[in-house]
Curated annotation (Swiss-Prot):
Cellular component GO terms, alphabetical: plasma membrane
Family named by the database record: Belongs to the peptidase A8 family.
Annotated source species: Borreliella afzelii (strain PKo) (Borrelia afzelii)
Name of the featured protein: Lipoprotein signal peptidase
Active site: D124, D146
Catalysed reactions, semicolon-separated: Release of signal peptides from bacterial membrane prolipoproteins. Hydrolyzes -Xaa-Yaa-Zaa-|-(S,diacylglyceryl)Cys-, in which Xaa is hydrophobic (preferably Leu), and Yaa (Ala or Ser) and Zaa (Gly or Ala) have small, neutral side chains
Pfam families given in the database record: Peptidase_A8
UniProt keyword annotation of Membrane present: yes
Protein keywords: Aspartyl protease, Cell inner membrane, Cell membrane, Hydrolase, Membrane, Protease, Transmembrane, Transmembrane helix
Gene giving rise to this polypeptide: lspA
Spans traversing the lipid bilayer: 9-29, 72-92, 96-118, 143-163
GO molecular function: aspartic-type endopeptidase activity
Localization terms from the record: Cell inner membrane
């Protein structure tokens, strides 16, 4: 197997593993946790597993938008953006930047799968107490795909601001 083929194979395994874990966790929540109920909580309600559905995007933004517009803005556009991110990740030479783009891609695909096959909305289940910060008693409920996107974005920003700029300035 050539170096390039091995690299693409590793990328494929990484993406499939992340998407599988995301979809498996959502499947288990749908199967075992009644919609709207708390399955269990840890550390005096600091962290809970709860089954909710999100028909909007980040933090339920746009959940009241017309169904046809949702298909365009929450399905078609993300698919085009994901294709773009994936193509960038294949061209990226820096390992941190590539991993961050692949995390964003995998998280996006995980939520697009929900939008395609779960008309009642994306399954969210990770719920944290937020102690009134920004006026929120609890952080908006999310899933592993959301975590991949956020971690990927943070990694990419760290890469862009610290690593890429440092290399550019030397």
């Amino acid at each position: 197997m050539s170096v390039k083929s091995k690299q693409y194979f590793n990328i494929f395994i990484f993406i499939i593993s992340l998407i599988f874990f995301d979809q498996l966790s959502k499947y288990l929540v749908v199967k075992y946790v009644k919609l709207g109920s708390v399955y269990f909580s840890f550390f005096e309600n600091f962290f809970r597993i709860i089954h909710v559905r999100n028909t909007g995007i980040l933090f339920s933004i746009g959940s009241n938008i017309n169904y046809s517009l949702k298909k365009i803005f929450f399905l078609a556009m993300p698919i085009f953006i994901l294709i773009f991110i994936f193509s960038l990740s294949l061209k990226e030479k820096n390992r941190i930047a590539r991993i961050s783009l692949l995390l964003i891609f995998s998280g996006g695909v995980g939520n697009v799968i929900d939008r395609l096959f779960r008309p009642s909305g994306v399954v969210d289940f990770l719920d944290f107490k937020f102690y009134g910060i920004f006026g929120l008693d609890r952080w908006p409920t999310f899933n592993f795909a959301d975590s991949y996107v956020v971690i990927g974005m943070i990694l990419f920003l760290v890469y862009d601001f610290f690593i890429k700029r440092k290399a550019f300035n030397t």
